């Protein structure tokens, strides 16, 4: 499973990259056939948004989350 992370108005640090990778590894337990995950993190003033597109054998799954803290947005995104 390949995880791509893109930042819009945010620098993706190594710690943030590792946090995302560890969170999305849990998804493999629920979806054994995940091919690719693309995560986009966006910062606009005080709005933090995390969105992800999972490519699986039978199509795509999309989810997004907005919070005041990026780590909280990522947590909620994975929980969806």
Predicted regions and their residues:
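N-terminal, polar/charged subdomain of small-to-medium soluble alpha/beta proteins
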Residues: 1-80
